[in-house]
């Protein structure tokens, strides 16, 4: 079976279509022995593993092997036994896709870690998985990372043929005028921004199929597999979760009316809050809290995780202001603490930076607020173009 899997590995690596080199590739310490890569369905986790193999090993180098736990072979053979065979044959790096498809996966990874000291394992899993929190056997030995959908920077590099680097939030704040000029010297970001908001986050927009239909299928899989299977929720509750997602999508980006949602979905308030948390873990929604608050308290705002999801859920009815705020929140997600703002600002970031998302000239300015504007391509002092925040990763 090892030979068959090597042939599959060679074919997949040879034919992988990875037109954009993901920023995460350079952020991972590949010398770590156990690396977990989480990400929502559709963001390119499989492609990422194959891209790593192609960059670091020759096609016929048997030191690296990609396997997918969806293979029926692993229904009759343990991961530990297989890893042992690979290790004895001279294997050094085992790339495991969809590791959660095998029961007791975390114990198996721990056993591999203990038994094969020279073997490095890189595995992918659903964004719903809480790798170390729910699997204490991985504490202290596993480094976890998040693979996200395309940033606007990655989308620009692909569509405009540029080679833009990511910038930090501080760089954008302090040097936004210069950065904007440098970017516009090689491409026109305004030409591509609307397309990115509509379909640029998920790499499968490159496939010659209907993007919206594909995204709806992916969203259903997120709920049916990532939420129900991993959270062990009975199938009979599937319709309730889908209805909740729809109700949240059409109600805008404000605070959820938990009592009304509980009545609409026919479940308890506590269950509604748990379902919203699961949808957030699946990267379908984002929960935005006030400063000092967190789950299980009710969030101050519930937003779609990215703007592509907004177009899929409410085609033709996307509120522009909600969309702009969703883009900004998504651009900072995972790397910065984004909280609900007050009357003068939309968001409070990292506890002290105040941002107001706008589509027009501010009538009055507060000196401690950064005005993020969607209606400009170049900024001035504390007014910064919205698209620049798409260069954060």
Give residue ranges: language-model regions.
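Conserved lysine of the Walker
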Residues: 45-46
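Short glycine-rich substrate-engagement loop in P-loop NTPases that contacts/grips substrate
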Residues: 61-93
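Interdomain motor-coupling "hinge/lid" segment immediately C-terminal to the ATP-binding subdomain
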Residues: 2-3, 8-10, 126, 132-239, ...
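Hydrophobic anchor at the beta1->P-loop junction of P-loop NTPases
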Residues: 37
């Amino acid at each position: 079976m090892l030979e068959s899997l090597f042939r599959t590995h060679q074919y997949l690596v040879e034919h992988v279509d990875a037109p954009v080199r993901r920023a995460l590739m350079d952020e991972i310490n590949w010398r770590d022995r156990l690396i977990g890569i989480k990400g929502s369905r559709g963001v390119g986790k499989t492609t990422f593993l194959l891209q790593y193999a192609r960059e670091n090993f020759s096609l016929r180098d048997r030191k690296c092997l990609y396997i997918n736990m969806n293979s029926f072979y692993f229904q009759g053979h343990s991961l530990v036994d297989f890893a042992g065979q690979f290790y004895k044959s001279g294997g050094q790096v085992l790339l495991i896709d969809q590791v959660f498809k095998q029961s007791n996966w975390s114990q198996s990874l721990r056993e591999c870690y203990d038994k094969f000291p020279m073997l490095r394992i890189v595995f992918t899993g659903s964004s719903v998985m809480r790798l170390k929190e729910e699997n204490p056997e991985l504490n202290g030995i596993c480094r976890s990372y998040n693979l996200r959908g395309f940033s606007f920077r990655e989308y620009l590099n692909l569509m405009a043929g540029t080679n833009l680097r990511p910038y930090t939030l501080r760089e954008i704040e302090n040097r936004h005028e210069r950065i904007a000029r440098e970017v516009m010297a090689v491409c026109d970001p305004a030409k591509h921004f609307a397309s990115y908001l509509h379909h640029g986050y998920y790499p499968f927009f490159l496939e010659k199929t209907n993007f919206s239909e594909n995204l709806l299928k992916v969203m259903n899989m997120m709920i049916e597999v990532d939420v129900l299977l991993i959270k062990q929720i009975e199938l009979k509750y599937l319709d309730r979760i889908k209805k909740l997602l729809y109700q949240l999508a059409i109600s805008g980006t404000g605070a959820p009316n938990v009592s009304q949602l509980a009545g609409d979905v026919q479940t308890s308030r506590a269950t509604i809050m748990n379902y919203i948390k699961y949808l957030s873990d699946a990267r379908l929604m984002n929960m935005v809290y006030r400063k000092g608050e967190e789950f299980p308290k009710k969030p101050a705002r519930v937003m779609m995780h990215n703007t592509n999801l907004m177009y899929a859920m409410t085609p033709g009815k996307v509120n522009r202001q909600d969309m702009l705020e969703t883009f900004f929140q998504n651009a900072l997600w995972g790397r910065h603490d984004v909280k609900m703002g007050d009357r003068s600002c939309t968001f409070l970031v990292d506890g002290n930076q105040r941002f107001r998302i706008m589509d027009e000239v501010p009538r009055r300015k507060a000196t401690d607020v950064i005005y993020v504007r969607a209606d400009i391509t170049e900024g001035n002092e504390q007014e910064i173009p919205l698209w620049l925040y798409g260069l954060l990763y």
